[in-house]
Amino acid sequence: MEDPVIRIPPYHYIHVLDLNSNVTRVEVGPHSFIRQDHERVVFSPKRMVMVPPRHYCVVLNPVARGPTGAVLFDGAGQAQLRHADLDIRLTQEPFPLYPGEELQQGVTPLQVVLADTALRLRALLDFEDEDGNKFVAGDEWLFEGPGTYIPHKEVEVVETLQATIIRHNQAIRLRARKECLDRQGTRRVTGEEWLVKRVGAYLPGVYEEVVDVVDAYVLTDKKALHLRATRTFEDVQGHVRRTGEEWLVTQEQSEAYVPDVFEEVVAEVLVTTLGPRQYCVVLDPVGPNGQPQLGQQRVVKGEKSFFLQPGERLQAGIQDVYVLSEDEGLLLQALQTIKDTDEDGTEVIRRAGDRWLARGPLEYVPPAEVTVLERRQALALAENEGIYVRDIRTGKVRVVTGQTYMLTESEELWEKELPPGVEVLLAEARGDTAGQDSGIQSSSGPSFGVQERDRTRAVTYQVPHNAAVQVYDYRERRARVVLGPELVVLGPGEQLTVLSLSGGRPKRPHARRSLCLRLGPDFCADIVTIETADHARLQLQLAYNWHFEVPEDPKALGRLFSVPDFVGDACKALASRVRGAVAAVTFDDFHKNSNRLICSAVFGFDEGGRLREHLRFVPNGLVVTSVDIQSVEPVDQRTRDALQRSVQLAIEIATNSQEAAARHEAERLAQEARVRLERQRLLDQAEAERARRELLELEALSAAVESAGAARAEAQARAEAARIEAEAAILQAKLKAEAVAIETEAELARLERMQAQEVRAQRARAEAEAARAQALAAVEASKVREVAAALGPETIRDIARAGPELQVKLLQGLGLQSALITDGAAPLNLFSTARGLLGLAVPPEPSTS
């Protein structure tokens, strides 16, 4: 059952509900509350709300209080509430919450606003503060620190504002959220932006917002700032800038520049520095009025540093001054009529489009009215080198060779075009490709490995020894032939004649291309198919030796090139003659007389019926001097087999006859060898018999000598042996006596040495023992002296007397006057009696040794 007595501690309270009147009241401790039957305690004792210093709390539906601060109650005794109202309570005595009151916000520390900080406040309803200031709902203002903000129920804290730190070379960009006055008292309209450049902390106003922190651009003598106006305004220097206007700010105007809100930074412009040998051309330069002069140019020479103004640009960047040596020049052209001086210093008028050449040595900076078309250098040409030069006024082309030449203002280099085949052959002649002989063998098409030729250089060709080259001039329609060794330099309208010769076996047309014609002597080979009268088809491989007859008249040299393919034409003509001659004979006749038939067919016979020595082709002077039959092969298989069988049979017959002759010769040589061998054998036998007879005679003589000398030698040997034995016995006895004497002397010496050693050892031991005893005695004596000196006489006397006195005292302590038990057999030692009775060990006797 619930206890009716409720003990309320100090600073606690309870709510008591009267069930009869349905009114709740507050009971505050300390006291003991006795609950009545018609009352009910809503909750157990609860601690009062305590607001410490610098804190506050918010109470919802606070009680109404009178002028004196007392709580107002209605007629039923219920505390009157201000419903939907708030009450902010600061530091005060602990207070209870009346029925209906709610603690909307607990005890909270008051907000401390630091320096350079502010609270943006907004009025929730119309009110008037303690200072008489009236605020309308929606008004905003700042509570700036340092200070402690006391909250009000009519005001809400929107945000906390921090001051923006403005450092050196910085500014902040502000924007007005509505019409207001800024910190300097200037009126700002909604959306207006401005800069604040004052160094330090800046706290924006209530209707100001920080858009950005703008860093200043540090300007040096090498960097400037390109600005553009976004609207018409007046800058800090007092100049009125129109929308879109661009200008440059340099270090002379400001070392650190902060762009205004209506200024847009286009770029940072670096200084343009010109060296003493440099210049530049500025396009669209800015005039004295600050406006760009469109279409104009200005040449700036070094040594100088400047900034390009807005709208200005360099034509080709920074350029080097033209420094010309003696062999250099500049081709110039006037863009408009100007006054100039020539090489002699005379003033001349240059019209627009005029061209002239400025020759070195000089330093030249072209003015804005002059353009440099080309930088020319004198071309050093050797005796065998040249260039093609064309006059642009007349169009004539000429060749300049063997001198150092510089083109004039009306001349230019001309490129000579050559057919691709000629280019390949010339490259092979120069060794620029992997071709073989210079112009003798080449492919019919252009090669991809050919290096590009300088077409402005004169085309030269080295004519080999014993060769000829034909050069045709298409302008004058005449040809000239050059015999090697010689260097050919082609004129502007000249071309080299390309020979297209047959090659291979059998000959194929256009197999070889060449620029030169070999004059020989040389040879060419061809394969000719012939048919005999008995229809035997044969294939001949023939080789012809040839050369050209060179006429002495230079005008007649052109006939050498009258036949383009002299190899093919000659081989065809010779093959026709051979085929005609062979067709009239049978195979056997041709096989027997092939060389005579072919030579007669090729060379023919003179009026006397003799075989000619050469064949001459009249159109080009080609002379064939000899014919060589390298091989003859039948074309028909059966003919080839029959010919092969006949050849094999002839070979077998010749081989058999050679074998028979060789066998007969071998038998003859073998028979002669056998006869010589038999004769030699008989001679050897006779010689052997004669040698054996001599041997027997010598053996008999030796036996006689041997029998006579054996007895004499034996007697001499016995006598000598007896003498040697006697001498050996005498020598042995003498040696034995000497050995015994030596042994005796050695033994005696050994015994003497042994005895001497023993005597010395005994003497050393005795001396060592005596020294040891003497040292021990000295040590013992020194020990006794040192112990006695250390203890002193008094201590020694006390030690000597301590033993007997102690024994007497012990016996007295035991209560014994005297006692002795012994038998007659045991001797008595009264000196150790007391020690024995006490159980002490007898001290050992000193050793007499």
From Swiss-Prot:
MVP repeats lie at residues 2-54, 55-109, 110-162, 163-215, 216-270, 271-321, 322-378, 379-458, 459-521. Gene3D superfamilies: 2.30.30.560, 2.30.30.570, 2.30.30.620, 6.10.250.720, 6.20.380.10, Band 7 domain (3.30.479.30), Major Vault Protein repeat (2.30.30.550). The keyword RNA-binding does not apply. One of its GO terms (cellular component) is ribonucleoprotein complex. It is found in: Cytoplasm; Nucleus. CDD domains: MVP_shoulder. The vault ribonucleoprotein particle is a huge (400 A x 670 A) cage structure of 12.9 MDa. It consists of a dimer of half-vaults, with each half-vault comprising 39 identical major vault protein (MVP) chains, PARP4 and one or more vault RNAs (vRNAs). This is Major vault protein. The gene is MVP.
